[in-house]
Regions:
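TPR-adjacent "capping" and linker segments in tetratricopeptide-repeat scaffold/adaptor proteins
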Residues: 1-13, 197-198
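Structural signature of tandem alpha-helical TPR/SEL1-like repeats
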Residues: 23-32, 58-70, 91-104, 125-138, ...
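Helix-start (N-cap) detector for alpha-helical repeat units in TPR-like alpha-solenoids
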Residues: 11, 45-46, 79-80, 113-114, ...
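Alpha-helical segment of the N-proximal tetratricopeptide repeat
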Residues: 9-46, 50-60, 91
């Protein structure tokens, strides 16, 4: 094994270690590894994407945005970078801008349930309700046990007054995650609205 292969293997091992730390919720520990990788190579796209993802999980949006912007500047094929930028714009309720970036992420990485979930919600929130619901349904078809998707789709159906469908989605989310406060509140909202409509 030559020096470049050994170096590449070391980088991959550290990226994998950072990924495992991220998945176990140890974002700050993951960031230490990733930041060291970026000191060694400021153009390491994978490390930039992972920094952005960890910062997003910690709700440090400015830092996540900076890392994601750097990733897409260096690599226009960074679907993770475009997804994170779109997610942040959604969080700021800049729906049309979010839709553009999330569509770009979806184009680069089709059929990714999380990208589709965020794109669907941004479409729905931007006034493209039918397309938003269809996109959320696609996300749910890809990942049928995701409480976030179930709740987002349920809220969309609630807003178009399809209470039966909304309630079923929220109850499914509660089956999967009984402590899900959002789903509990949404079930209560459906019940209140159903009673109000019946008079």
């Amino acid at each position: 094994m030559d020096d470049s292969q050994r170096l590449s293997s070391d980088i991959l091992e550290r990226l994998e270690r950072a990924e495992q730390l991220k998945l176990s919720g140890k974002h700050n520990e993951a960031l230490k590894i990733l930041e060291q990788l970026l000191i060694e190579d400021p153009q390491n796209i994978s490390a930039l994407e992972e920094v952005a993802d960890n910062e997003l999980s910690l709700e440090r949006f400015a830092r996540a945005e900076a890392a994601a912007r750097q990733a897409v500047t260096l690599d226009r094929g960074s679907y993770t970078g475009f997804y994170i930028l779109g997610y942040i714009l959604s969080h700021k309720e800049k729906w049309s801008e979010a839709v553009q970036l999330l569509r770009k992420a979806n184009h680069l990485k089709p059929n990714n349930a999380e990208i589709l979930r965020c794109l669907g919600w941004a479409l729905f929130s931007s006034g493209q309700r039918a397309q938003g619901i269809v996109t959320l349904e696609r996300s749910l078809n890809l990942e049928s046990e995701n409480p976030l998707t179930l709740c987002d789709l349920g809220v969309a159906y609630l807003q178009i007054r399809n209470f039966i469908k909304a309630r079923a989605l929220f109850l499914r989310a509660l089956d999967l995650d009984p402590g899900n406060v959002r789903a509990q509140e949404c079930v209560q909202a459906v019940e209140r609205l159903t009673k109000a409509v019946r008079g």
